[in-house]
Amino acid sequence: MVRFITDHRDEYGVEPICAVLPIAPSTYHRHRAGQIDPARRSARAQRDDVLRVEIQRVYDAHHQVYGPRTVWKQLRREGIRAARCPVGRVMRGRGVAGVVRGRAWITTTHAADGGRPADLVDRQFVATRPNQLWVADFTYVATWSGFVYVAFVIDVFAHRIVGWRVSASMRTDFVLDALEQAIYARSGTGLTGLVHHSDRGTQYLSMRYSDRLADAGIAPSVGSQGDAFDNALAESVMALFMTEVIRRRGPWRSLEAVEFATLEWVDWFNMRRLLGPIGDVPPAEFEAQYYQQAAVA
């Protein structure tokens, strides 16, 4: 509006234009003076100018998925003092918003009831140390060349993704590869007392998968098929993945494109993404704090 008045003031004058627009001449002159000499702008406007640059930097650095609360938390971590309300106001003024999480799709084909492991978790997705409880799940992604499937194994303690795999097939090999990656990544920290929890998917109840858990000394736990609450933490991470990567950056051309995006996102998620349930720190940092405290205990 200020620009419109400036563009037409020589022809019509400021006051006549303001008379038909919802703006007072004094407001226009104040804004115009601030444009000509930024030092004459209000203290709040000058603070917003500085904050606007920092908000955009954080927003871009974190894949443009953070909302006002998480942007504010990241600014505080970096030592930039700002109240939460101004962060939200500046973001709204720029039309910048975080992504809205959707739900993950149910992909489970359940196995027969006979002989499945007991539910050792009972919807209590808490752990007091790393390698105490893992949860596993997978979802599907539509690409131009057909569906591909993405599996995760997540350590509940810090919500860290310890294994993942992208495949064109839903066969057992696919989720078994994600498990193998998790076992390899965590083998140096000990797997004693570890519980692996999943839904009743045929892949997770297969003989090969069960044997691999047994070989590694991992106790299996299985919830009820089709009930998201029985694998709520895995569903939560999967929903983040679908919202922050798949739905936002699609459509997808190929398995390779999904695989590269997943690799990039998992690294960012583990190393940099702030997670509210663990105190607004990244999973890797939360784990590092645990090991530091354990070393001096």
Which residues does each PLM region occupy?
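Charged DNA-binding/catalytic regions of mobile-element recombinases
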Residues: 1-297
